[in-house]
Amino acid sequence: MNIDQHHQLQQQHQQQMLQQQAQAQAQAQAQAQQQQQQQQQAAAAAAAANAAATTSSSPRQVSFNVSDHYQILEIVGEGAYGIVCSAIHKPSQQKVAIKKIEPFERSMLCLRTLRELKLLKHFNHENIISILAIQRPINYESFNEIYLIQELMETDLHRVIRTQNLSDDHIQYFIYQTLRALKAMHSANVLHRDLKPSNLLLNSNCDLKICDFGLARSIASQEDNYGFMTEYVATRWYRAPEIMLTFQEYTTAIDVWSVGCILAEMLSGRPLFPGRDYHNQLWLIMEVLGTPNMEDYYNIKSKRAREYIRSLPFCKKIPFSELFANTNNNTSTSTSNTGGRTNINPLALDLLEKLLIFNPAKRITVEDALKHPYLQLYHDPNDEPISDKIPEDFFDFDKMKDQLTIEDLKKLLYEEIMKPL
């Protein structure tokens, strides 16, 4: 073999080596791409699994498009326009609740969401549910749902009343915490207007937090009372009589009435005024409280409402000690509607008498209710904080709600969500 042939063989060998290296590199790149695709598919599957929760009663899955910092556990609550899931915040290992809201089908739902969002950001109180974080959308175009990260509360008072007998100590503590939250809300010039057992959240430590501020309004703003009634679709059992009798203005007394209804329900294990409709609701109230006297009668400004009350049979007031006598004498140990209570604290009935007064001007105030002897064990004026008053323009969107489209409200919600907490 001459030198030229030797060089030619070397060149052929080098070309073969280069081809083999190129093939090996191409195979390695293909394998890497395949592995990357598999990893992406696995990550997507994991994210889909993480972002879906299934109710025990239904096979349907609910998509939660939240940060991968959260591991979705299960659905813990569901309402007309929101679903709440429990989740774990992975970095801190803290259990939280994530509330998914899809309000953009109806203006009313947008308004309720905007009120709640603004108020929960305003308050910072131990007995009012707080927002820990908000899942912010990438941009306005992708803004189709709202995710609020909140404290996780295991249950609510409605479920507790239905499943167990409450001790007098529990009742005192729950009413105290409710009034403590109301003191802060009313000091901020805010009426809740939808207090009921299902809106009082509880945890295993018996801590209570008020939620659902979708119907709340400013005390100073009374222009929208008619609009309030058209929107008031919640359970009527806890509504103050002045709401149904269209008083000219509503005061903090409407929330106080609701607290009275809740106290009565905890004492007996059943709703006190479970009206079937508007008329039956008023009749049940008057069956217990009696027909209004002349002073209270003329405090009702609506002539039509006064005429309706005059058309009803006269009722004599039933003292709560007598009304609850059947409960006191009940020796049942079941968890039925009777509550199974064999003894009711007379101080609880005394407070109830002051909470459930027909005339709102004569009803006990939150501050005086906190001082009542029934709550003496918990009352501490140095640990019942007030809140900053809401600005005058806080609820301006409500004043012009008839002119606002869903798109207008969506923009307001987007702006509110993008603001820092």
Swiss-Prot record:
| Extent of motif TXY | 230-232
Summarize the PTM comment: Dually phosphorylated on Thr-230 and Tyr-232, which activates the enzyme.
Gene Ontology terms, cellular component aspect?
cytoplasm; nucleus
**Coiled-coil ranges (or none):** none
Q: Does the keyword Transferase apply?
A: yes
Q: Which GO terms describe its molecular function?
A: ATP binding; MAP kinase activity; protein serine kinase activity; protein serine/threonine kinase activity
Keyword vocabulary terms for this entry:
ATP-binding, Cell cycle, Cell division, Kinase, Mitosis, Nucleotide-binding, Phosphoprotein, Serine/threonine-protein kinase, Transferase
Regulation of catalytic or functional activity? Activated by tyrosine and threonine phosphorylation.
Phosphothreonine carried by residues: 230
Q: What are its cofactors?
A: Mg(2+)
Could you say which enzyme class this protein belongs to? transferase
Binding residue positions for ATP:
76-84, 99
Which residues are recorded as modified (Phosphotyrosine)? Answer: 232
Annotated Protein kinase domain residues: 70-375
What is the active site of this protein?
Answer: 194 (proton acceptor)
A biological process (GO) of this protein is: filamentous growth of a population of unicellular organisms in response to starvation
Q: Which CDD domains match?
A: STKc_ERK1_2_like
Under the heading SMART domains, the entry gives: S_TKc
Task: Give the reactions, separated by semicolons, that this protein catalyses.
Answer: L-seryl-[protein] + ATP = O-phospho-L-seryl-[protein] + ADP + H(+); L-threonyl-[protein] + ATP = O-phospho-L-threonyl-[protein] + ADP + H(+)
Q: Which family does it belong to?
A: Belongs to the protein kinase superfamily. CMGC Ser/Thr protein kinase family. MAP kinase subfamily.
UniProt remark on domains: The TXY motif contains the threonine and tyrosine residues whose phosphorylation activates the MAP kinases.
Name by which UniProt lists this protein: Extracellular signal-regulated kinase 1
